[in-house]
């Protein structure tokens, strides 16, 4: 067997050739960090000097984290998932990706978490693309004024606090005053637009549930499905059981999904239910990250938290497709205190607010809109002409009615004009009541408010106002073309007004039984009048409140 010989020159030449051909640029640099502490959904990581703000990091067990605090020696990371498997000393790797969420039409009718992962058990979602959660809002030159109506189907709102497409309208009130009900009714009211198939009319809806009970979210989903509204709605759910980081991110995830449609020239309605819980989650995260607290222990940038979110709602210019995203943020108050820190912040950011008063709600005035301090700063220009015509003095009439009502509590007798004001005001308040999940088409609202403001309901007992309205609208629907004309033209022409006058006079004759002395109540039974002998000096006294 030949002896193996090694020549030193051959070895030297081979090493020189390898060294000459080596290119450092082909070497991959891998940064590895290590967990120093992990608890309460927050981890602190050493290393990773090149990490970006809002970059996704991957822990050893596959859990993702979001880089937040970029300090000199360590990084504060929000853990996006279960943190029980993350321990001190474990490796952390960069992904090189900014936090983003998948988007597209396939999300309609689905329930997803703040990372865009479906949680409704209906399988995977084939996304069209992804969109970063933190995006710059449209600039001034990329917007145009709000000029298209966003009908809620609620008489009290569409008449006095109108909302336009691209507007941000705050819904604020104590717990259990009907805030979510208004938002859900607004979604249900878009059904006719969706069924039309016209992209310019259709509104895609996003319901972002932040810190709600899982049973409440399931109830909202079931309501939308039962009423045929789930097919054009996406639900982004971060229930109360989710970590604070998920609740903080949920509104941005919903906004990113909506922006994809907005920049495609489509119309979007997004509801944040509610931003109070998002602010509390952000406060918890910030305190755990050891950021300095400010007023009410909120961090100093809590205003920016909401402003950068709500500024994404806009009506885009024609050059960008004229799409829109309308925002309905919800804020929960404590004891009707709208002057608290978070409520005043969001009021100053939005284009108006709908204040729901718990006293009105408990008095069965639902929706419990307090017309006195509710306002829409830009929606009036988007109101349809017929509604603007009939509701012009409605807000003033109700304000005068409330003043007169307070005065009448202490006055022994009133003049005829004051009594007339109280009579009409009480009927207008009754007319603005509306059952839940029954939004009205705008033409029905116009007819109802026209009848109330022009005195055609003054003779109708207050307890029969809603029955009169319901039966009169049914009469118009079957016997005339008035509602069809209003829906097509959105104008209250003189000929339409004359036809309405004739119809309501004829209907009142039948409603009151051609002037017979019938009792008009909740039931439909008829009773004979009692003789004076049977009613000997009987008096009915109406107690004053």
From Swiss-Prot:
The record marks 374 as: Required for activity. It comes from the Bacteria. ATP binds at residues 173-180. F-type ATPases have 2 components, CF(1) - the catalytic core - and CF(0) - the membrane proton channel. CF(1) has five subunits: alpha(3), beta(3), gamma(1), delta(1), epsilon(1). CF(0) has three main subunits: a(1), b(2) and c(9-12). The alpha and beta chains form an alternating ring which encloses part of the gamma chain. CF(1) is attached to CF(0) by a central stalk formed by the gamma and epsilon chains, while a peripheral stalk is formed by the delta and b chains. Pfam families: ATP-synt_ab, ATP-synt_ab_C, ATP-synt_ab_N. Its main location: membrane. It is found in: Cell membrane. PROSITE patterns: ATPASE_ALPHA_BETA. Belongs to the ATPase alpha/beta chains family. Gene3D superfamilies: 2.40.30.20, ATP synthase alpha/beta chain, C-terminal domain, P-loop containing nucleotide triphosphate hydrolases. It comes from Renibacterium salmoninarum (strain ATCC 33209 / DSM 20767 / JCM 11484 / NBRC 15589 / NCIMB 2235). Produces ATP from ADP in the presence of a proton gradient across the membrane. The alpha chain is a regulatory subunit. This is ATP synthase subunit alpha. One of its GO terms (cellular component) is plasma membrane. It is a peripheral membrane protein. It catalyses: ATP + H2O + 4 H(+)(in) = ADP + phosphate + 5 H(+)(out). HAMAP family: ATP_synth_alpha_bact. Its EC number is 7.1.2.2. Keywords: ATP synthesis, ATP-binding, Cell membrane, CF(1), Hydrogen ion transport, Ion transport, Membrane, Nucleotide-binding, Translocase, Transport. One of its GO terms (molecular function) is ADP binding. It is an enzyme of class 7 (translocase).
């Amino acid at each position: 067997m030949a002896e193996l010989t090694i020549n030193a020159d051959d070895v030297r030449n081979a090493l020189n050739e390898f060294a000459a051909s080596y290119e450092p640029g082909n070497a991959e640099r891998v940064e590895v960090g290590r967990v120093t502490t992990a608890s309460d959904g927050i981890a602190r990581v050493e290393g990773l000097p090149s990490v970006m703000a809002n970059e996704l990091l991957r822990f050893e067990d596959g859990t993702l984290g979001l880089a937040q605090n970029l300090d000199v020696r360590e990084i504060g990371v929000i853990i996006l998932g279960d943190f029980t498997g993350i321990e001190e000393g474990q490796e952390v790797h960069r992904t090189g990706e900014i936090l983003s969420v998948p988007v597209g039409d396939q999300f309609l009718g689905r329930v997803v978490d703040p990372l865009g992962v479906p949680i409704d058990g209906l399988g995977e979602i084939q996304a069209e693309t992804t969109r970063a959660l933190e995006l710059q809002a449209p600039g001034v030159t990329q917007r145009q004024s709000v000029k298209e109506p966003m009908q809620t189907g609620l008489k009290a709102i569409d008449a006095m606090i109108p909302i336009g497409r691209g507007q941000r309208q705050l819904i604020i009130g104590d717990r259990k005053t009907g805030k979510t009900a208004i938002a859900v009714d607004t979604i249900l009211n878009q059904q006719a637009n969706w069924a039309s198939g016209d992209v310019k009319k259709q509104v895609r809806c996003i319901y972002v549930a932040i810190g709600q009970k899982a049973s409440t979210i399931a109830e909202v989903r079931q309501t939308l499905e039962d009423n045929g509204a789930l097919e054009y709605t996406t639900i982004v759910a971060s229930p109360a059981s989710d970590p604070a980081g998920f609740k903080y991110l949920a509104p941005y995830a919903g906004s990113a999904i909506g922006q994809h449609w907005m920049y495609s020239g489509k119309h979007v309605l997004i509801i944040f239910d509610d931003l109070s819980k998002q602010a509390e989650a952000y406060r918890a995260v910030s305190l755990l990250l050891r950021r300095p607290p400010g007023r009410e222990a909120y961090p100093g940038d809590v205003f920016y938290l909401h402003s950068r979110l709500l500024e994404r709602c806009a009506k885009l210019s024609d050059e960008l497709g004229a799409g829109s995203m309308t925002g309905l943020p919800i804020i929960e108050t404590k004891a009707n205190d709208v002057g608290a820190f978070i409520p005043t912040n969001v009021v100053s950011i939005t284009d108006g607010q709908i204040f729901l008063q718990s006293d009105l709600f408990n008095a069965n005035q639902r929706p419990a809109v307090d017309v006195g301090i509710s306002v829409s700063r830009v929606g009036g220009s988007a109101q349809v002409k017929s509604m603007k015509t009939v509701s012009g003095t409605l807000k003033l009439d109700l304000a005068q009615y409330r003043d007169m009502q307070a005065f009448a509590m202490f006055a022994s007798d009133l003049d005829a004009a004051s009594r007339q004001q109280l009579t009409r005001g009480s009927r207008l308040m009754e007319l603005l009541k509306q059952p839940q999940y029954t939004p009205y088409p705008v033409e029905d609202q116009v007819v109802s408010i026209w009848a109330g403001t022009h005195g055609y309901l003054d003779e109708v007992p207050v307890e029969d106002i809603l029955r009169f309205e319901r039966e009169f609208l049914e009469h118009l629907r079957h016997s005339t073309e008035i509602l069809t004309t209003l829906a097509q033209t959105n104008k209250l022409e003189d000929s339409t007004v004359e036809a309405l006058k004739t119809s309501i006079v004829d209907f009142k004759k039948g409603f009151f039984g051609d002037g017979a002395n019938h009792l008009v109540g909740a039931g439909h039974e008829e009773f004979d009048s009692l003789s004076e002998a049977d009613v000997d000096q009987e008096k009915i006294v109406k107690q004053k409140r």
